[in-house]
Regions:
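Conserved MFS/SLC helix-loop-helix module at the cytosolic interface between two early adjacent transmembrane helices
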Residues: 58-96
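A late C-terminal transmembrane helix in Major Facilitator Superfamily
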Residues: 326-357
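Helix-loop-helix hairpin linking two adjacent transmembrane segments in secondary transporters
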Residues: 136-183
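Extracytoplasmic gate region of multi-pass secondary transporters
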Residues: 27-28, 208-258
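Residue-level signature of mid-helix packing/kink "hotspots" within the transmembrane helices
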Residues: 25, 53-61, 144-145, 254-262, ...
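C-terminal membrane-cytosol helix-exit motif in multi-pass small-molecule transporters
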Residues: 168-194, 377-382
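C-terminal transmembrane helical hairpin of 12-TM major facilitator-type secondary transporters
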Residues: 268-317
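Cytoplasmic helix-loop-helix junction between adjacent transmembrane helices
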Residues: 103-139
């Protein structure tokens, strides 16, 4: 096994992750424009985020299951291209059902990309999987953060049809990944090693701790998507800020999450994955509450800390899942990166309905209470997979 991360291979995978998740970030950035120009309610807007989340996540374990049995590397270039095509068509869709369909199409492309790319991220990381997965994850974090940065100027300049430009970077990245595939394939385990891994004979699988960890990830996802969906609207409706400043605040949170990811991976290697996850949950409740009583500028500082605490553990939990299920790393990645996040995305329309009826300040307070549940679940996990028991 390699001692370190292969830089060229990881750069290709992380860049693919970035260009794929730009499309997911674009959905959240389009919410204020769709509300203003298409007359969508906050609940309907939240449902778009839910559709993007579910379509990009629920089927990920299925892709992971098939890739555990037979690798499907072509899903990486095809996934990023399809993700860009779907979101590009959102701005020219003439009705809410068509908008929803385009969002789902984009989400399916995202779903196809993630399990297979996470598998190869595991392969090219050698013995430093937490560090390698943090590099892979930060690509997705950066992509989600760039979604609003890229989308907002396009829509401000060209109207909603400006989303058509988003197909260009996705197509470019799809071709780049297609070019890199032959080299990436050299990192796959030998056939006999892969067969042993699929049977799970090398190490036991710990479904009990895995399920509890997924519970914590789901809670984190409720918090994450609640904030991603309504931070911009909170700035506009509660703090009286412009759309540009509102989406900038969202980008600050997401970019800080990328920094948190780079810190969280190496830190988890030193003090333990469980400790990093638990501390992040412990910090989130007071930080989100402080945000609700702050102005726009202090709010941005707090959002940076919130983003680091929320997003910084994404890579850590992917590695935890793969360690709990060492013979099913595709399924583990699909559930950790997909299904659990999709379940958390159910919170978007729930929080949207709460915001429509009780207001955004009350909604933010509700979001601030959730990390306490995640903290309890994180503390119930074993300190290492070797100590796990079902």
């Amino acid at each position: 096994m390699r001692k370190g991360v292969d830089k060229r291979a990881m750069a290709a995978l992380s860049a693919g992750h970035l260009f794929t998740d730009v499309n997911q970030g674009a959905v959240a950035a389009l919410v204020p424009f769709l509300v203003a120009e298409r007359g969508l309610s906050l609940a309907a807007a939240g449902s778009l985020v839910l559709a993007a989340t579910l379509s990009s996540s629920i089927v990920q374990p299925l892709f992971g299951h098939f890739s555990d049995r037979r690798p499907l590397p072509m899903l990486m270039p095809l996934g990023v291209a399809l993700g860009g095509l779907g979101i590009a068509l959102v701005g020219v869709a003439s009705s809410y059902p068509l908008i929803l369909l385009c969002v789902v199409l984009s989400g399916l492309g995202v779903a196809a990309f993630h399990p297979e790319s996470a598998r190869f991220a595991n392969y090219v990381s050698g013995s430093r999987r937490a560090r390698g997965m943090s590099f892979f994850s930060v690509g997705g974090n950066a992509g989600f953060a760039l979604g609003p940065v890229i989308t907002t100027p396009l829509v401000l300049s060209f109207g909603l049809p400006g989303t058509l430009f988003l197909v260009l970077p996705a197509s470019f990245m799809g071709l780049a990944l297609l070019h890199e595939l032959p080299r990436l394939l050299t990192f796959q385990p030998k056939a006999e090693e892969a067969a042993v891994g699929r049977k799970g004979a090398k190490a036991p699988e710990h479904w009990g701790p895995f399920a509890r960890m997924i519970g914590a990830v789901t809670v984190r996802s409720f918090v994450y998507f609640g904030l991603v969906t309504f931070v911009s609207s909170y700035y506009i409706q509660v703090l009286g800020s412009s759309t540009l400043l509102a989406n900038s605040a969202l980008s600050v949170m997401l970019f800080a999450g990328g920094v948190g990811t780079l810190v969280g991976g190496p830190l988890a290697d030193r003090i333990g994955r469980r400790a990093v996850l638990a501390v992040s949950m412990l910090l989130l409740s007071p930080l989100i509450y402080a945000f609700t009583v702050s102005g726009p500028l202090l709010g941005m500082i707090l959002l940076a800390l919130i983003g680091a605490a929320t997003i910084g553990t994404f890579g850590v939990t992917v590695v935890m899942g793969q360690e709990y299920l060492p013979g099913r790393i595709g399924v583990a990645a699909g559930v950790t990166m997909g299904l659990s996040i999709g379940l958390g995305g159910i919170g978007a329309p729930i929080f949207g309905a709460l915001a429509d009826n009780q207001g955004l300040p009350t909604t933010m307070l509700a979001i601030s209470a959730l990390p306490l549940i995640g903290l309890l679940l994180a503390l119930s996990l074993p300190r290492s997979p070797a100590r796990s028991s079902d």
